[in-house]
Design a protein with these regions (language model features):
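Bacterial Sec-dependent N-terminal signal peptides
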Residues: 1-25
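Domain-level marker for long, solvent-exposed, non-transmembrane regions
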Residues: 20-157
């Protein structure tokens, strides 16, 4: 009986670090809607991670656009348009070349990100063993992004 308890205890101890790491990964893409402007754009609070501060900022912008396009906003104030722009089940794979180019470093996704709502000193920065994290407030130009996806025949309506 003692050996079973010892084995169970060692197993629990061995699995604890992986559970902590899995939780950290989930929080890496936390995106909250702060509000919707009269022009239909969405103000989001988003986190990005990278090997340096510039990479973390760019990743935060990519995360925000990706979430608006594919995942939809899960958290935030009422009144935010929570639905993703692309609702087709296999769109990521079907239009893989298009989205690889669109989300490339310095790609067209930046045309639909505005830093107008970013206030000086409002960004949260942190450095850890992996790299930098950067939390910032940005605006996604959702109507223009939707028009682009329609023009490129990615979405209908």
């Amino acid at each position: 009986m003692r050996t079973w308890i010892s084995i169970l205890f060692m197993l629990v101890i061995a699995l604890m670090p992986s559970a902590i790491k899995a939780q950290a990964v989930v929080n890496r893409t936390s995106i909250k809607c702060m509000g919707v402007e009269l022009d239909g754009s969405q103000t989001l609070r988003v986190i990005g991670y990278g090997k340096n501060r510039a990479d973390a900022k760019e990743q935060a912008m990519k995360n925000a656009v990706w979430t608006v396009v594919f995942d939809g906003i899960r958290e935030g104030v009422a009144g935010c348009n929570m639905r993703p722009l692309v609702t087709e089940a296999n769109a990521r794979e079907r239009y893989e070349d298009y989205f690889n180019t669109f989300f490339a470093d310095g790609g067209d996704y930046k045309k639909y990100v505005s830093l107008r709502d970013t206030k000086k000193g409002s960004a949260a920065r942190a450095k850890d063993k992996v790299g930098y994290s950067y939390e910032m407030t940005i605006r996604i130009l959702r109507p223009q992004l939707k028009a682009r996806l329609k023009a490129d025949n990615i979405i209908s309506n």
